[in-house]
């Protein structure tokens, strides 16, 4: 009797797995039927990219969200813009699409409606990520001759990151360089409270928040890596710092830290893209530039900001003072919270620097620079997937 129950259980399990595979194959055919002439036909939204041979999911997000993320996000964006056409719905849609709290002099203040703007940009970035990966970077890497499916996915992911970090590093540099607190850490805390800002500064700050909120989602859309929890902690701390610095009127230090961190990020993403294209030697040289930029920006410049926060910030601001209607939101608990978040970020930086040192040692030993955080990009079911698609 027990053997018969075991056989029935095994049969039911096998049937369930077969049904899952059939669903994935049918959905894959619908999503990729337009590209049959390409040797690797699966688009980056194809469900087979997120499922192992035995039917196990390789990512944490629901399968339908991975497959239809572009369509879902574009539909939400279209609905928001359609609401602008309705006089009764327009007031509800405007905070998501446009900046709020414009002042008579052209500057912008702050308020609860500001929470809508970064939420909208989470949706925009999710759709933009899929579009730019699938219709810009994927055709490029295929035309380059790359046929390893995992390498194609990694190249497209890094291409999206490179594009974002490069654009917003230049934008952050422009805002930082044209300010009166450029290269002067003590001026980051002068003129407190920093309540009003230009439209460019406000858009930059809130869009950055939207990007980092979306990065938390991306962690669950991509295959988990070795440093998943470090990345998750980094994204949470980054979002908390952006929200607190914006809400408690410390805008300048937020601009400085975002600018500092974006520098090494776009160099790292660019180096990985070159590695996936086969430029091993150039990648090694670029890795040296990345290490130099990392040490300079995250261990030197960021440490200078930390020193001012710990030793001089309360004195520069004028002491602890809580007067919310007038924008003074700086008491001891808030100050301690900022210090804890900044030193948590510093701890993560040192953990990653330890990984960088390991890679640097391998490079000096004659090996190629490889990301110790990633899984093996060289092993893939390339042959079987190609045969299935022909």
Swiss-Prot record:
- Tell me yes or no: is Glycoprotein among this UniProt entry's keywords: yes
User: What EC class is this?
Assistant: transferase
Q: What is its main location?
A: endoplasmic reticulum
| Pfam families reported for this sequence | TRAM_LAG1_CLN8
InterPro entries per UniProt: Lag1/Lac1-like, TLC-dom
Q: Does the keyword Ubl conjugation apply?
A: no
Instruction: Report the coiled-coil segments.
Output: none
* Name by which UniProt lists this protein: Sphingosine N-acyltransferase lag1
Q: Which organism is it from?
A: Schizosaccharomyces pombe (strain 972 / ATCC 24843)
Q: Which gene encodes it?
A: lag1
């Amino acid at each position: 009797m027990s053997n018969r129950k075991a056989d029935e259980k095994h049969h039911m399990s096998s049937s369930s797995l077969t049904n899952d595979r059939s669903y994935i194959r049918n959905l894959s055919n619908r999503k990729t039927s337009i590209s049959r002439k390409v040797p690797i036909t699966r688009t980056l939204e194809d469900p087979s990219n997120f499922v192992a041979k035995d039917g196990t999911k390789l990512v944490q997000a629901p399968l339908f969200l991975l497959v239809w993320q572009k369509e879902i996000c574009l539909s939400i964006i279209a609905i928001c813009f359609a609401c602008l056409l309705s006089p009764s719905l327009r007031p509800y849609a405007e905070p998501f699409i446009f900046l709020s709290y414009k002042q008579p002099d052209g500057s912008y203040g702050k308020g609860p409606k500001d929470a809508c703007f970064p939420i909208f940009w989470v949706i925009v970035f999710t759709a933009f990520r899929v579009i730019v990966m699938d219709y810009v970077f994927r055709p490029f890497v295929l035309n380059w001759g790359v046929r390893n499916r995992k390498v194609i996915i990694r190249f497209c992911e890094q291409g999206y990151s490179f594009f974002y970090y490069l654009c917003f590093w230049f934008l952050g540099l422009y805002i930082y360089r044209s300010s009166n607190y450029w290269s002067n850490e003590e001026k980051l805390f002068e003129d407190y409270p920093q309540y009003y800002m230009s439209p460019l500064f406000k858009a930059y700050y809130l869009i950055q928040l939207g990007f980092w909120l979306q990065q938390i989602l991306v962690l669950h859309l991509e295959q988990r890596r070795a440093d998943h929890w470090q990345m998750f902690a980094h994204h949470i701390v980054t979002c908390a710092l952006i929200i607190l610095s914006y809400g408690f009127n410390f805008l300048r230090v937020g601009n400085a830290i975002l600018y500092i961190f974006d520098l090494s990020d776009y160099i790292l993403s660019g180096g990985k893209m070159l590695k996936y294209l086969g430029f091993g030697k150039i990648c090694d040289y670029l890795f040296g530039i990345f290490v130099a930029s990392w040490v300079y920006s995250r261990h030197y410049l960021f440490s200078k900001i930390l020193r001012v926060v710990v030793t001089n910030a309360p004195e520069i601001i004028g002491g602890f003072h809580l007067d919310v209607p007038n924008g003074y939101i700086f008491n001891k608990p808030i100050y301690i919270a900022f210090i804890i978040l900044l030193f948590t970020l510093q701890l993560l930086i040192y953990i990653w620097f330890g990984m960088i040192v390991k890679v640097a040692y391998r490079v000096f030993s004659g090996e190629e620079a490889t990301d110790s955080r990633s899984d093996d990009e060289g092993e893939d079911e390339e042959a079987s997937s190609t045969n299935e698609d022909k």
